[in-house]
Amino acid sequence: RDEFVVRACGVVAERGEGLKNPNIASGDVEIVVDNLEILNRAETLPIQPFAEDNQAGEELRFKYRYLDLRRPKMQNMLKKRAEMYRRIHEYMDGRDFIEIQTPILANSSPEGARDFLIPSRLQEGKFYALPQAPQQFKQLLMVGGVSRYYQLAACFRDEDPRADRLYGEFYQLDLEMSFAENGEEVRTEVEPLMKQLATDFAGKKLLDLSDLAVGDGSPIPRISY
Protein backbone atom coordinates (compact mmCIF):
# COMPACT_ATOMS: atom_id res chain seq x y z
CA ARG A 1 0.00 0.00 0.00
CA ASP A 2 1.17 3.52 -0.77
CA GLU A 3 2.72 5.37 2.17
CA PHE A 4 2.83 2.38 4.51
CA VAL A 5 6.07 2.41 6.50
CA VAL A 6 7.70 -1.02 6.61
CA ARG A 7 10.90 -2.52 7.94
CA ALA A 8 12.51 -5.11 5.72
CA CYS A 9 15.34 -7.22 7.11
CA GLY A 10 17.46 -9.28 4.79
CA VAL A 11 20.46 -9.26 2.48
CA VAL A 12 21.15 -6.56 -0.10
CA ALA A 13 22.12 -8.19 -3.38
CA GLU A 14 22.70 -7.14 -6.95
CA ARG A 15 19.71 -7.54 -9.21
CA GLY A 16 19.86 -10.12 -11.90
CA GLU A 17 20.23 -9.31 -15.58
CA GLY A 18 17.04 -7.91 -17.02
CA LEU A 19 15.75 -6.88 -13.61
CA LYS A 20 17.71 -3.65 -13.18
CA ASN A 21 15.80 -0.37 -13.31
CA PRO A 22 17.87 2.71 -14.23
CA ASN A 23 14.97 5.02 -13.36
CA ILE A 24 15.23 4.60 -9.58
CA ALA A 25 18.11 5.09 -7.15
CA SER A 26 18.05 1.46 -5.98
CA GLY A 27 17.61 0.07 -9.47
CA ASP A 28 20.78 -2.04 -9.39
CA VAL A 29 20.13 -3.80 -6.07
CA GLU A 30 17.35 -5.60 -4.23
CA ILE A 31 16.73 -6.95 -0.74
CA VAL A 32 16.35 -10.68 -0.28
CA VAL A 33 13.87 -10.34 2.60
CA ASP A 34 13.96 -12.58 5.66
CA ASN A 35 11.46 -10.58 7.71
CA LEU A 36 8.93 -7.86 6.83
CA GLU A 37 7.16 -5.73 9.45
CA ILE A 38 4.57 -2.95 9.01
CA LEU A 39 5.58 -0.05 11.28
CA ASN A 40 2.84 2.39 10.34
CA ARG A 41 -0.27 2.32 8.18
CA ALA A 42 -1.54 5.23 6.11
CA GLU A 43 -4.86 6.29 4.70
CA THR A 44 -5.24 7.26 1.05
CA LEU A 45 -3.51 10.59 0.47
CA PRO A 46 -5.50 13.64 -0.68
CA ILE A 47 -2.90 14.21 -3.41
CA GLN A 48 -0.40 11.84 -4.98
CA PRO A 49 3.05 13.32 -4.36
CA PHE A 50 4.88 11.19 -6.91
CA ALA A 51 2.46 11.64 -9.81
CA GLU A 52 3.61 14.48 -12.05
CA ASP A 53 0.54 14.31 -14.30
CA ASN A 54 -3.10 14.93 -13.38
CA GLN A 55 -2.17 16.80 -10.24
CA ALA A 56 -4.74 18.27 -7.88
CA GLY A 57 -5.69 21.92 -8.16
CA GLU A 58 -3.48 24.64 -6.73
CA GLU A 59 -5.72 25.25 -3.71
CA LEU A 60 -5.56 21.60 -2.66
CA ARG A 61 -1.81 21.49 -3.27
CA PHE A 62 -1.29 24.53 -1.01
CA LYS A 63 -3.49 23.00 1.69
CA TYR A 64 -1.30 19.89 1.69
CA ARG A 65 1.92 21.68 0.89
CA TYR A 66 4.01 19.20 2.89
CA LEU A 67 2.88 16.46 0.49
CA ASP A 68 3.20 18.60 -2.62
CA LEU A 69 6.83 19.32 -1.75
CA ARG A 70 7.61 15.62 -2.16
CA ARG A 71 6.99 15.78 -5.89
CA PRO A 72 10.26 15.42 -7.86
CA LYS A 73 9.60 18.75 -9.59
CA MET A 74 9.26 20.56 -6.27
CA GLN A 75 12.31 18.80 -4.81
CA ASN A 76 14.31 19.93 -7.81
CA MET A 77 13.12 23.51 -7.36
CA LEU A 78 14.18 23.50 -3.70
CA LYS A 79 17.62 22.22 -4.66
CA LYS A 80 17.92 24.88 -7.37
CA ARG A 81 16.95 27.57 -4.89
CA ALA A 82 19.60 26.39 -2.42
CA GLU A 83 22.21 26.27 -5.18
CA MET A 84 21.25 29.77 -6.32
CA TYR A 85 21.71 31.06 -2.78
CA ARG A 86 25.10 29.35 -2.61
CA ARG A 87 26.17 31.05 -5.86
CA ILE A 88 25.06 34.44 -4.53
CA HIS A 89 27.04 33.96 -1.32
CA GLU A 90 30.08 32.83 -3.28
CA TYR A 91 29.91 35.81 -5.62
CA MET A 92 29.40 38.44 -2.93
CA ASP A 93 32.00 36.96 -0.58
CA GLY A 94 34.48 36.95 -3.45
CA ARG A 95 34.02 40.71 -3.81
CA ASP A 96 34.72 41.43 -0.15
CA PHE A 97 31.12 42.04 0.84
CA ILE A 98 30.29 41.04 4.42
CA GLU A 99 27.05 39.18 5.07
CA ILE A 100 25.19 40.62 8.07
CA GLN A 101 21.67 39.78 9.23
CA THR A 102 19.84 42.93 10.29
CA PRO A 103 16.99 42.91 12.87
CA ILE A 104 13.51 41.74 11.93
CA LEU A 105 11.68 43.38 14.84
CA ALA A 106 12.28 47.13 14.71
CA ASN A 107 10.60 50.51 14.63
CA SER A 108 8.60 51.54 11.60
CA SER A 109 10.46 53.06 8.65
CA PRO A 110 7.85 53.56 5.88
CA GLU A 111 9.13 52.87 2.38
CA GLY A 112 6.06 53.16 0.20
CA ALA A 113 3.90 50.34 1.55
CA ARG A 114 2.05 49.59 4.76
CA ASP A 115 3.89 47.94 7.65
CA PHE A 116 3.07 44.63 9.23
CA LEU A 117 2.76 45.52 12.92
CA ILE A 118 3.57 43.14 15.79
CA PRO A 119 2.23 44.08 19.26
CA SER A 120 4.78 44.20 22.06
CA ARG A 121 4.02 41.97 25.04
CA LEU A 122 6.19 44.00 27.42
CA GLN A 123 5.17 47.50 26.32
CA GLU A 124 1.40 47.73 26.15
CA GLY A 125 0.05 49.75 23.25
CA LYS A 126 3.34 49.71 21.35
CA PHE A 127 4.26 47.74 18.27
CA TYR A 128 7.20 46.43 16.33
CA ALA A 129 7.18 46.71 12.55
CA LEU A 130 8.50 44.02 10.24
CA PRO A 131 11.03 45.61 7.85
CA GLN A 132 9.94 46.57 4.35
CA ALA A 133 13.69 46.63 3.62
CA PRO A 134 16.83 46.88 5.79
CA GLN A 135 17.46 50.45 4.61
CA GLN A 136 18.19 52.18 7.91
CA PHE A 137 20.25 49.32 9.32
CA LYS A 138 22.53 49.04 6.31
CA GLN A 139 23.17 52.79 6.32
CA LEU A 140 24.15 52.53 9.97
CA LEU A 141 26.52 49.71 9.02
CA MET A 142 28.25 52.08 6.60
CA VAL A 143 28.74 54.55 9.45
CA GLY A 144 30.03 51.67 11.56
CA GLY A 145 32.86 50.94 9.13
CA VAL A 146 31.29 48.08 7.16
CA SER A 147 31.95 49.45 3.71
CA ARG A 148 30.49 46.54 1.71
CA TYR A 149 27.45 44.79 3.21
CA TYR A 150 24.97 42.26 1.85
CA GLN A 151 22.33 39.77 2.91
CA LEU A 152 19.50 37.75 1.44
CA ALA A 153 16.99 39.86 3.28
CA ALA A 154 13.44 38.99 4.27
CA CYS A 155 11.14 41.90 3.40
CA PHE A 156 7.54 42.35 4.54
CA ARG A 157 5.07 44.71 2.86
CA ASP A 158 1.36 44.86 3.61
CA GLU A 159 0.34 45.59 0.03
CA ASP A 160 -2.91 44.79 -1.72
CA PRO A 161 -2.78 41.44 -3.55
CA ARG A 162 -2.43 41.24 -7.32
CA ALA A 163 -4.51 38.89 -9.42
CA ASP A 164 -1.97 36.07 -9.20
CA ARG A 165 0.23 36.83 -6.20
CA LEU A 166 0.51 38.45 -2.78
CA TYR A 167 3.59 40.52 -2.04
CA GLY A 168 3.40 40.18 1.75
CA GLU A 169 6.76 38.42 2.20
CA PHE A 170 9.67 38.06 -0.17
CA TYR A 171 13.46 37.76 -0.16
CA GLN A 172 15.89 39.99 -2.00
CA LEU A 173 19.61 40.39 -2.43
CA ASP A 174 20.18 43.53 -0.38
CA LEU A 175 23.51 45.33 -0.47
CA GLU A 176 25.18 48.64 0.30
CA MET A 177 28.53 50.14 -0.69
CA SER A 178 30.29 53.09 0.91
CA PHE A 179 31.59 55.88 -1.32
CA ALA A 180 29.84 54.66 -4.47
CA GLU A 181 29.80 57.58 -6.89
CA ASN A 182 26.48 56.69 -8.49
CA GLY A 183 23.99 53.93 -9.13
CA GLU A 184 25.97 52.72 -12.13
CA GLU A 185 28.72 51.49 -9.81
CA VAL A 186 26.22 49.28 -8.01
CA ARG A 187 24.68 48.02 -11.25
CA THR A 188 28.09 47.15 -12.64
CA GLU A 189 28.96 45.33 -9.42
CA VAL A 190 25.99 42.94 -9.55
CA GLU A 191 25.50 42.65 -13.32
CA PRO A 192 27.76 39.58 -13.77
CA LEU A 193 25.84 37.81 -11.01
CA MET A 194 22.47 38.52 -12.63
CA LYS A 195 23.72 37.17 -15.96
CA GLN A 196 25.12 34.04 -14.33
CA LEU A 197 21.92 33.29 -12.41
CA ALA A 198 19.67 33.85 -15.42
CA THR A 199 21.83 31.68 -17.66
CA ASP A 200 22.42 28.83 -15.21
CA PHE A 201 19.00 28.63 -13.57
CA ALA A 202 16.56 29.88 -16.18
CA GLY A 203 18.45 28.40 -19.11
CA LYS A 204 18.16 31.62 -21.06
CA LYS A 205 19.82 34.96 -21.56
CA LEU A 206 18.67 37.60 -19.13
CA LEU A 207 17.53 40.10 -21.72
CA ASP A 208 17.47 40.55 -25.45
CA LEU A 209 16.77 44.13 -26.48
CA SER A 210 17.61 45.86 -29.76
CA ASP A 211 19.91 43.00 -30.80
CA LEU A 212 21.90 43.44 -27.59
CA ALA A 213 21.86 40.00 -25.96
CA VAL A 214 23.03 39.62 -22.40
CA GLY A 215 25.18 36.56 -21.94
CA ASP A 216 27.66 37.32 -24.69
CA GLY A 217 29.62 39.89 -22.68
CA SER A 218 27.42 42.85 -23.57
CA PRO A 219 26.17 45.03 -20.71
CA ILE A 220 22.53 44.95 -19.72
CA PRO A 221 20.79 47.88 -21.45
CA ARG A 222 20.03 50.76 -19.07
CA ILE A 223 16.49 52.10 -19.11
CA SER A 224 16.04 55.64 -17.81
CA TYR A 225 13.09 56.68 -15.69
PLM region spans:
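Class II aminoacyl-tRNA synthetase catalytic cores and aaRS-like
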Residues: R1-Y225
